[in-house]
Amino acid sequence: MTGKTQTSNVTNKNDPKSINSRVFIGNLNTGIVKKADIEAIFAKYGKIVGCSVHKGYAFVQYISERHARAAVTGENSRIIGGQPLDINMAGEPKPYRPKLGTKRPLSTLYSAYDFDYDYYRDDFYNRLFDYGHGRVPPPPRAAIPLKRPRMSVPTTRRGKGVFSLKGGSRSASGGSSSSGSKLKSDELQTIKKELTQIKTKIDSLLGRLEKIEKQQKAEAGAQKKQTEDHTDSVQEECKSETADNSTEEHIEGGHDADGEEMTDGIEEDFDEDGSNELMENHISDIEDTSN
């Protein structure tokens, strides 16, 4: 890579036109790439009035901003000297372009973003309200950073510009508070409906339990009455059997007494007859002896 240096080394003019038409070239391998090489590469996009090479980077000054933007678009990420170039407009904030194999720091993720704190505040109070009423909180919504455009306020009308900004912030906060109150009222209605449904279910369950308890009491009473009736019938049967047995014993005892009386009478009659016969025999024997 060779070339003849024909441009100036001045690339640090502070006038707006020069700043807006200046190109920054980063990640430059200055050990291999020289100033003439840079001029040869970037000269095809427009006339170069200045070029300065430093350790690891360089600046190219064009006459027109249009030429500078064309160079940024055409040569960005081009590999020269074994390294991809990081090219952007010198007068604009440098966008973050991470190198291969490195992690992007978290500070650069949200450097140009502002969080919508009203959004997160309403979400926090809603989740706190749900937790206090025993409801399971929903999963948190994904964080969506909102990029707010920069508003330029003229210095001559500074007071009016500040007032308009304050008014806009008040209107935004008022809108968020009204939306938050509406959301809370909707949630209250939903909670009220759910509580009513739960109360209805509890009442129906209590009614069923009362019916089951009454049925159990009725069945227990009927079973108890049946047991008592069975016991009474058994006792009556036992009493009747006892009475029958006593009557039979009484009858058998009467028959035995009559038999004994009859036997005694017969024996007495037999004794009397025997004694009479003996007397008669004795008398007859005496009469025979006397004759």
Curated annotation (Swiss-Prot):
Q: Which InterPro entries match?
A: hnRNP_C, Nucleotide-bd_a/b_plait_sf, RBD_domain_sf, RRM_dom, RRM_HNRPC/RALY_subfam
Q: Where is the composition biased (Basic and acidic residues)?
A: 225-257
User: From which residue to which does any coiled coil extend?
Assistant: 182-219
Q: Which residues form the RRM domain?
A: 21-92
Question: Bias regions of kind Acidic residues — which residues?
Answer: 258-275
* GO MF annotations, alphabetized: RNA binding
Low complexity bias: start-end ranges = 164-182
Q: Which SUPFAM superfamilies match?
A: RNA-binding domain, RBD (SSF54928)
Q: What keywords is this UniProt entry annotated with?
A: Coiled coil, RNA-binding
Region (Disordered) location:
152-185, 216-291
Write out the similarity annotation. Answer: Belongs to the RRM HNRPC family. RALY subfamily.
Recorded hits in PANTHER family, A to Z, give: HETEROGENEOUS NUCLEAR RIBONUCLEOPROTEIN, RNA-BINDING RALY-LIKE PROTEIN
| Identification of the protein by name | RNA-binding Raly-like protein
Q: What is the lineage of its organism?
A: Eukaryota, Metazoa, Chordata, Craniata, Vertebrata
